[in-house]
């Protein structure tokens, strides 16, 4: 393929790319965590009502990132290879809150739903890298006040991060790839239609509700399909 035909590429990744590395969602088949709805531990109201419960949920999720067996998989690495070889504008947008893309070496990366390895203070709005457990009374490393340090995660009812930059990139994109996304979480599910002039590729375990909006589909695990597609793409 003549890559000179394409100058602006936007790639969207979802839970499917991280699941193969062993990232758990902590939801059972009913969508519950220890009999709690995820919405009950992932809203600003939940944090105000029961901060200990919310912190425990995210401490469990954050502990996964400290697991020595957790590592980026071939799909993450293939995206790094593509970024390094791409001569135009490259943007990787992820819905995932883990650190696997960055550990693999991705540079032009936006976490639209926040980062599990960061926290911020509600009192002073400072953000910090944080991989340890977080206590309810954790003093803010910047202002020293207690009770306001929370996960740097976009909760239900909050605005996803970097949307202006993402929308601008989608409007300019001439190639759009969606990997491992459910196709039913907005605003990300609408990205394929916002990339109005782009060639659109979907890589997923199965078809999604938005599959008809794509030009091509590749069905299978991200760890095999993404490297295969990118190898062919770069030939």
Swiss-Prot record:
It is found in: Cytoplasm. One of its GO terms (cellular component) is cytoplasm. The active site is at residue 113. It holds the Pfam family SIR2. Substrate binds at residues 58, 61. Binds 1 zinc ion per subunit. Its cofactor is Zn(2+). Keywords: Cytoplasm, Metal-binding, NAD, Transferase, Zinc. GO terms for molecular function: histone deacetylase activity, NAD-dependent; NAD+ binding; protein-malonyllysine demalonylase activity; protein-succinyllysine desuccinylase activity; zinc ion binding. Residues 1-235 form the Deacetylase sirtuin-type domain. NAD(+) binds at residues 14-33, 95-98, 180-182, 204-206, 222. It catalyses: N(6)-acetyl-L-lysyl-[protein] + NAD(+) + H2O = 2''-O-acetyl-ADP-D-ribose + nicotinamide + L-lysyl-[protein]; N(6)-succinyl-L-lysyl-[protein] + NAD(+) + H2O = 2''-O-succinyl-ADP-D-ribose + nicotinamide + L-lysyl-[protein]. Zn(2+) binds at residues 121, 124, 140, 143. 2 residues (Tyr-58 and Arg-61) present in a large hydrophobic pocket are probably involved in substrate specificity. They are important for desuccinylation activity, but dispensable for deacetylation activity. This protein might be subject to alternative promoter usage and might also encode a protein with a 13 residue-longer N-terminus. NAD-dependent lysine deacetylase and desuccinylase that specifically removes acetyl and succinyl groups on target proteins. Modulates the activities of several proteins which are inactive in their acylated form. This is NAD-dependent protein deacylase. The gene is cobB.
């Amino acid at each position: 393929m003549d890559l000179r035909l394409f100058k602006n590429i936007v790639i969207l990744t979802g839970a499917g790319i991280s699941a193969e590395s062993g990232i758990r969602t902590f939801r059972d088949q009913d969508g519950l965590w220890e009999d709690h709805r995820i919405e009950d531990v992932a809203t600003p109201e939940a944090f105000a009502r029961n901060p200990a419960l919310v912190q425990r949920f995210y401490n469990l999720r954050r502990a996964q990132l400290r697991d020595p067996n957790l590592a980026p998989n071939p799909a993450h690495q293939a995206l790094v290879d593509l970024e390094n070889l791409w001569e135009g504008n490259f943007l990787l947008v992820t819905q995932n809150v883990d650190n696997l893309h960055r550990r693999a070496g991705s540079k032009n990366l936006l976490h639209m739903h926040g980062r599990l390895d960061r926290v911020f203070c509600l009192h002073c709005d400072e953000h910090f890298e944080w991989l340890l457990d977080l206590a309810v009374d954790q003093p803010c490393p910047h202002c020293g006040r207690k009770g306001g340090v929370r996960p740097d995660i976009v909760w239900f009812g909050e605005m996803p991060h970097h949307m202006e930059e993402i929308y601008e990139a989608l409007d300019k994109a001439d190639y759009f790839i969606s990997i491992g996304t459910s196709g039913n979480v907005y605003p990300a599910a609408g990205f394929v239609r916002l990339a109005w002039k782009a060639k659109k590729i979907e890589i997923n375990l199965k078809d999604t509700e938005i599959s008809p909006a794509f030009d091509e589909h590749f069905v299978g695990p991200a760890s095999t399909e993404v490297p295969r597609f990118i190898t062919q793409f770069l030939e």
